[in-house]
Amino acid sequence: MSTETATAEIIDRQTMEVDLACVGFGPATGGFLTTLVNAWNENPADPAFESRVAPGMPLQVLCYERADDLAAGVSGVVTKGKGIRATFPELNPAEIPMAVDVKKEQIFYLLDPIGASKRSGLLRMGDAALKMLGPVLGVKDAAYELPWAPGFLHKNGGLVMSIGQFNQWVGSNLMSSGLVQIWPSMPVSEPLFEGTSVTGIRLADQGVDKQGNPSDGFMAGMDVKAALTVVGDGPVGQIGRALDQKFGTAAKHREWALGMKFLIELPEDTELEAGTVWHTFGFPEPEIFGFLYVHPDRLCSVGVFVPSWMGEPSRTAYRYLQHYIQHPLLWKHLQNGTLRSWGAKSLEESGKHGEPILSGNGFARIGEGSGSTNMLTGSGVDEAWVTGTQLRAGQPFTEENLKNSYEKRRRASWVEKGASEAIDARTGFHKGFIPGLIGMALAGLTGGKLALKGHIPTASEQIKKAHAATIASVSPEKAGDVALA
C-alpha cells in the first residue's frame, strides 16, 4: 500500500448527501441543469422533484467545477446552435457577452509563405500550380478562398460565442432559479464506488504537498453521496478517467488534439465585422486546421488545432500558433491588435470511436468525454449541450433505467446520427494530408456511407513515432538526452 493511499484512508472526512452531484460545468452540464430547471419551473409540485435526502424540499442539486470562475475558458467557438436554440427558442445573442450570429463564413487554403512546412511532393506541385494561376483564381495574401464548400462544413445561421462567457450566462440563470448550486474552485478527486455502482464523489484535499500528504492549512475533501453522479468533466477529466479505469475504454479511444488560441482586440479601423468566421488549412503545417472568429466589440478568437496524427512534430503548439497568426492573410488584420488572453484545450478526436460506457448504476456521462464530438463537421459544443438535455430526471438511477431513458434518447437523436456518419471521416489522415481530405469529402458527401478506413495507430505507436522523429531532428550528441517516458 502506498503512503498516499494509507494517508487517505486514515483521514476523517465529512459526508454530505445530495440527490444529484455534477462534475464539471461546461455546455453538457449546462444543458442538463437547464433542462432540469425548466421542467421544475413548469411543474414544481411533481413528486419527481422532491428530494430523497431532504423530504419536503426540492431536489438537492450541486455542481462542482475545478476552474476558479465559470467564465475562465477563453475558447472561441462557432456552432450551428441547433440544440442551444431548441432550449432557448427566443434566444437573442446580444444577451450573451461576446455572442453574435454568424454573418459571413469563408474557407481558405493557406500557402506556405516562408517555405518551412513539411509538404509532400504532390502538395508542392499543387501549390506551384496555384501560384502560377493566382491572378486567374484570385490567390491573394498567399491564400486561396474555396469558391464552394460542402454543406457539412457550413455554420451559416449559427452562433459565434465565447465558451467561458456562455457558461457564465447559463450558470447565472441556473443559480437564480434556486434549485441548483454551482461551486467553482472545487475540484473533484475521485468517484466513490460500492462494487460497480457509483455512490458519489470525493472533493479534492486542500493544503497538501507534492506527494498528496497533508501540510500547512490542510483541509480534507468532503465525500458527497448522491443518487446520481453526472460526469461532464471534458475529454481528460479526473472522474471520467477514473470511470474508464474502472469500466474500461472503447477499443479505438486513441486520438487527441490540442487547441491553442489567442483572444485579440482588433484595431479600431479593422475591416472584419462581428460574425465573421474563417476556417483555414494548409499552414503552418498541412495537417493543422486554423480558425478566426470575430466577436462583438472588435474581439477576435484566432487559433489552431494540432492533431494527434502529426507523427513528426517539429514545434510546440504555441510556436505553431505564433507562425499561424503571422500568415499574410491574418497578419494584416491582427498586427496592430492587442492580445487580451490566451489558452489551450485538449480535444477528443476519436468521436464515436471513443465513446465510453455512457451510464451505469448511479452515474451517467455527458458531453465531449462521452464521445459526442462530430469530427466531420468539427463541432462539439452544441452536441455536448444536447447530450445534457437528453439526460432528464428518472428515478431510481439504475443502469437499466438510464439505458432505457438517457441512452435510448441519445441513440435516436441527430447527435448520434452525425457522430455515426463521422466515425471514419478523419481516419485517412493517418495515411497523409491528401488522403485525409479525400476521406473527409467522401464521408461528408455520402453521409458516412463511404470513407477511407484503416488502422488507427495506438497511443504508444504514435508516441514512438514522434519520439523517433524527434531523435532524427537533433544532433547525434544530443540524441541521448531525449528520453522516451
Set out the residue ranges of the language-model regions.
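Helix-loop-beta segment of a Rossmann-like dinucleotide-binding subdomain
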Residues: 136-167, 172, 305-307
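FAD/FMN-dependent oxidoreductases across multiple families
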Residues: 310-387, 395-405, 409
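N-terminal FAD cofactor-binding segment of flavoenzymes
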Residues: 35-39, 43-46, 54-135, 413, ...
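Beta1/beta-strand and adjacent pyrophosphate-binding region of the FAD-binding site
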Residues: 10-28, 62
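Glycine-rich Rossmann-fold phosphate-binding loop(s) that bind the pyrophosphate
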Residues: 25-27, 66, 163
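C-terminal auxiliary extensions adjacent to catalytic cores
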Residues: 423-485
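Active-site-proximal substrate-binding core of FAD-dependent oxidoreductases
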Residues: 54-58, 371, 375-377, 390-433
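Predominantly flavin-linked oxidoreductase catalytic cores and closely associated redox partners
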Residues: 35-38, 52-57, 161-169, 173-330
